[in-house]
Amino acid sequence: MTNKVVKIGDIPVANDLPFVLFGGMNVLESRDLAMRICEHYVTITQKLSIPYVFKASFDKANRSSIHSYRGPGLEEGMKIFQELKQTFGVKIITDVHEAHQAQPVADVVDVIQLPAFLARQTDLVEAMAKTGAVINVKKPQFVSPGQMGNIVDKFIEGGNDQVILCDRGSNFGYDNLVVDMLGFNVMKQVSKGSPVIFDVTHALQCRDPFGAASSGRRGQVTELARAGMAVGLAGLFIEAHPDPANAKCDGPSALPLDKLEPFLQQIKAIDDLVKNFPELDTSK
C-alpha cells in the first residue's frame, strides 16, 4: 500500500514519515491562556524536532449541557488564531460545526476538522471540501473503521482529496470507549493510504451515565498513546492544560502541561523505532 502525503504548508503528513503533533487545548478559554499553552508546545516541539500544529476549538457546539462553556465564538476565535500565527509562526487546526463556518475558518487556519458527531453530514462535508483546505476527519464513535472510506469518498467527490483520518475510540457498551488497534490499518486501507492519526485525549473519555459532563482517564494517557504510536501512524492528537482540574472542557482527559516534554520524549522514541523497521508482509 502506498502512503499518501498530505502537506500542511511545509509540514508533510504521512503514515511512514516522522509523526506530526496536533496539540494544544480543548477550547479557547482566553487569549492569554492560548498564548501560554501554544508557546509551551512550540518550545518543546522545536527542542525535540517534532513537526507541530496547534489545536483548539473556538466553539464547542456539542456540549452535553446547555450551561457548559462553549468558547469565544467565531469572530473572537479567529482573532486569537491570527495572533497565535503571527506570534509563533504556528500552523493551526480547529473544528467547524456548520456549513457557513467552513470558508471563514479556512481563511484563517491551516486544517479544518470535521467533528465525529457530524462526520456523515453531507452538507457540511461538501462545504468543507469546497474550501480546498486540508481536512481532518474524526472517526465517529459509532462508525466502524471500514466505513471511513465512504466519508473520504464524499470529500473526493467534492473536489478535495487532502484528507487526514483521526481515530478517537469506539463505543464499548454505554458511556465507555475503547481503541481498536487493528482499526488504524483498516482506515489506511479503505482511504487508499491517507494519513491516519490518533486522538488519545478523547479516547480517554468516559461518562457518568447521569452526568452532564465527560469524565476521563488521564492517568492512562501514556500507555494508550504508546500503544497507538507503535502501530505506525502519521500523527498524534493531544490536549494539555496547566490546571486540568479547572479546565473548562475535558480536563479529566487532558495531559498536565508540565508533563508534555517527558511524554513526547517517549512518543518520539517509539515513533522513531517503529518507522525504522522494514515493512513485513505477513498476509501471504
Curated annotation (Swiss-Prot):
InterPro entries on file: Aldolase_TIM (IPR013785), DAHP1/KDSA (IPR006218), KDO8P_synthase (IPR006269)
Pathway annotation: Carbohydrate biosynthesis; 3-deoxy-D-manno-octulosonate biosynthesis; 3-deoxy-D-manno-octulosonate from D-ribulose 5-phosphate: step 2/3; Bacterial outer membrane biogenesis; lipopolysaccharide biosynthesis
Sequence similarity: Belongs to the KdsA family.
Keywords: Cytoplasm, Lipopolysaccharide biosynthesis, Transferase
An individual GO BP term: keto-3-deoxy-D-manno-octulosonic acid biosynthetic process
Alphabetical list of Pfam families matching this protein: DAHP_synth_1
Intracellular or extracellular location(s): Cytoplasm
EC class of the enzyme, as a word: transferase
Catalyzed reactions per annotation: D-arabinose 5-phosphate + phosphoenolpyruvate + H2O = 3-deoxy-alpha-D-manno-2-octulosonate-8-phosphate + phosphate
GO cellular component: cytoplasm
Main location: cytoplasm
Organism: Pectobacterium carotovorum subsp. carotovorum (strain PC1)
UniProt feature coiled coil, ranges: none
EC number, as in UniProt: 2.5.1.55
Protein name according to UniProt: 2-dehydro-3-deoxyphosphooctonate aldolase
UniProt gene name: kdsA
Molecular function GO terms recorded: 3-deoxy-8-phosphooctulonate synthase activity
